[in-house]
Amino acid sequence: MFEQKISSEALTTTTSIPATGQITQRPLRDSVRQAVSGYVAQLNGQDPTELYELVLSEVEAPLLDIIMQYTRGNQTRAATMLGINRGTLRKKLKKYGMG
């Protein structure tokens, strides 16, 4: 169909596939952990509200953007890659001003 170029960094950080067939995401998890820890360290005793939603949106928006670019805007293919139905994808794209 078409040739997709993936950087070697992306391969080493996100696509190690063990015998189970599952993609190993430890480097991604470690990056998120480090970012959240840095954010919490800067709170200085304050308790923010909706931290869960903040973290999810900070990860979800770029994920959707990257997958939509990868699939060249094909929402059906993107939804399949993400493991969500197309209607849910459309809602999320609208939420982040991408659809």
Curated annotation (Swiss-Prot):
Alphabetized UniProt keyword annotations: Activator, DNA-binding, Transcription, Transcription regulation
UniProt signal peptide: none
Molecular function as annotated in GO: DNA-binding transcription factor activity; sequence-specific DNA binding
Gene3D superfamilies named among the record's database cross-references: Homeodomain-like
DNA-binding region of this protein: 75-94
Superkingdom of this protein's organism: Bacteria
SUPFAM superfamilies: Homeodomain-like
Region described as Disordered: 1-25
Subunit structure: Homodimer.
Function: Activates ribosomal RNA transcription. Plays a direct role in upstream activation of rRNA promoters.
Family note: Belongs to the transcriptional regulatory Fis family.
Name the UniProt record assigns to this protein: DNA-binding protein Fis
